[in-house]
Design a protein with these regions (language model features):
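Active-site neighborhood of glycoside hydrolase catalytic domains
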Residues: 1-21
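Carbohydrate-interacting/catalytic domains
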Residues: 3-5, 22-30, 43-58, 100, ...
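Active-site beta-loop-alpha junctions enriched in small/polar residues
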Residues: 13-17, 66-68, 105
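Active-site clefts of carbohydrate-active enzymes
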Residues: 57-81
């Protein structure tokens, strides 16, 4: 296939044992579904992020999907827009490849039955017609935010790499922080994992890992354009009740 079409990407759509998923990667599949869909806590995301960025990166290329045609994750079934936004931030900034199943941007969340992960009126069994234009006019869509995330990814080489992921300590389990650097492009990400309440914490940046000398450093928030001065122990507060962009900071460090 690659002799005629080298741009083709083979995706292993397999949620199975880690050994089998890794074997598919070694056999030639360029990308794979991952367990990100079920990693929700700070500890789970940190451990899994380290695994795919360092532990298995020589042969396993993860694709972080926020949902799939088969999986309507429990954490999305409340329909809270902030949860959809924060999961999109995580998926789009932790790894170079991410994906979603149509309807995510419209906050589709109804489950077929309580305790299950199957979508109500699943598109696997019927043709679905979605009113994207109408949702856009009513402001009931995450599409502009998703487009913004993809524009940020396109503009920043650091977010197009897998192995440069570094996590940083925070004083709260409700907020996760990590960084990615490629040359002079240094991006820091702070995400509120609580979609319902404002959370604040101190982020303890590993300055050596960031490659920054000195104390204070200037950053620009790529989501809202705000300029801020941060330091090795930065207090941040993120309120999901504000526009969806404020579930997170995605900042570029001015080097």
């Amino acid at each position: 296939v690659h002799k005629e079409s080298p741009e083709v990407v083979f995706l292993a759509e397999a949620f199975t044992r880690p050994a089998m998923m890794h074997a598919l990667g070694k056999a030639g599949f360029h990308q794979s579904y991952t367990y990100f869909t079920w990693r929700t806590s700070k500890w789970e995301i940190t451990e899994y992020g380290r695994e795919v960025a360092q532990g298995t990166s020589a042969f396993f290329r993860p694709n972080f999907w926020v949902n799939t045609p088969d999986i309507n994750p429990f954490h999305l079934q409340s329909g809270n827009p902030a949860m959809f936004a924060l999961r999109a931030v995580l998926a789009s900034t932790l790894t170079p490849s991410w994906g979603m199943y149509a309807g995510y941007e419209l906050y589709e969340h109804r489950a077929f039955k309580e305790g299950g992960e199957e979508y109500m009126d699943s598109e696997k069994y019927e043709i679905k017609v979605r009113d994207w234009e109408g949702a856009g006019k009513k402001g009931l869509t995450l599409a502009p935010f998703i487009a913004q995330l993809n524009a940020i990814r396109k503009a920043h080489p650091a977010l197009q790499r897998l192995r440069n992921l570094t996590f940083h300590d925070t004083d709260s389990d409700a907020i996760i922080a990590y960084s990615k650097r490629e040359g002079k492009d240094l991006v820091l990400v702070v995400v509120n994992l609580d979609p319902s309440y404002a959370q604040g914490t101190t982020v303890h940046w590993n300055m050596q890992a960031l490659g920054i000398d000195g104390h204070d450093f200037e950053v620009k928030d790529l989501l809202d354009g705000a300029s801020m001065t941060w330091n090795p122990h930065t207090f941040v507060s993120l309120n999901p009740a504000r526009p969806v962009g404020k579930v997170a900071h995605i900042v570029q460090v001015k080097l």
